[in-house]
Amino acid sequence: MGAVKNCVKILYHKEFAIMEKNELKKLNEEAKKQYDELCKQGLKLDMSRGKPSPAQLDLSLDMLTHCLDGDYMSETGVDCRNYGVLDGIEEAKRLCMPMLGVAHDEIIIGGNSSLQLMYDTMARAMLLGVLGGDKPWGKNEKVKFLCPAPGYDRHFAICQSLGIEMITVPYTPDGPDMDVVEKLVSEDELIKGIWCVPMYSNPEGITCSDETVKRFANLSPKAKDFRIFWDNAYCVHHLTDTPDTLLNLLEEAKKTGKQDMVFMFASTSKISFPGGGLAFIGASAENIKFIKSQMTFQTIGYDKLNQLRHARFFKDFDGIKEHMKKHRALIEPKFKIVLDMLDKEIAPTGF
């Protein structure tokens, strides 16, 4: 770490502008030497964002080996090896409903990716429209979307791939700047929605305040087919004994009669297996009926064996919460090491 500290001091030296050429040359040679020393260590660090460690993946291994044991029938008698059940088996719904805070008729269990669910939801809106809309979004001269920033680049990539104009909304310590959001959506009917990661949003870990959630729920968009894409990816991913809390957007929207404005998403990707978990969408019962009527042309049903594995492994929402404590035990010490080293080695340089 000492070499890294020295490199940082060199890279962020505050007196470059007044140094002589020979001093700069010497400093460059010193930095190159230290860089070469780091390279010689042969470190193979996977810095990919959001990938659980092998130890974290091991936490769910029994799901793959002992959960089914030849019994592939759901509790309602569905053979999960076969076709059918568009919106997910009962026990999978019951497992995932508390993560979003929705009722039985307000959820669809999808495949292995919430990102895919979000993309599909956006694509259907563009091609087919949403509940209450008079035409598909794509039939408008232009489609605009509010994008709180900093935000999730893959959300923005969805917009980019579909030719949707993105409008930046600044973040505050309470979440997206709702003064800006309220003004923009009330003035422009081509603004069809907004992205939001409401809990522990990267990179600052911001969770939307109660007031922010209530203002989301009470938005009055000029577009009658406006939708909030509420990507609650980290709804159970707590690392402290005093976790953040988040109001239930759908329940708040029901109080204002605007529940059809809400699409909520989550998954077990960072709970069980990335790329091998369960993804799900929550919305009003009317929205769910409408979405299912569109989805029926897209799929006969998702992977029910995976749904059954998850339901039997976790058993219930309490099982998920206990499982997340095991993740915390593995992750929290790593956070502490990084933060301690940043404070010790980098902070003294003034950054």
Predicted regions and their residues:
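Short, intrinsically disordered, charge-balanced linker/junction segments flanking boundaries
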Residues: 12-16, 337-351
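N-terminal "arm"/small-domain region of PLP-dependent enzymes with the aminotransferase-like
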Residues: 18-87, 97-98
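Conserved PLP-binding catalytic core of the aspartate aminotransferase-like
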Residues: 54-55, 164, 349-351
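Conserved core of the PLP fold type I
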Residues: 72, 78-224, 235-257
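Conserved core segment of the aminotransferase class I/II
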Residues: 110, 251-332, 341-345
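Hydrophobic "anchor" residues on beta-strands that sit immediately upstream
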Residues: 193, 227-228, 263
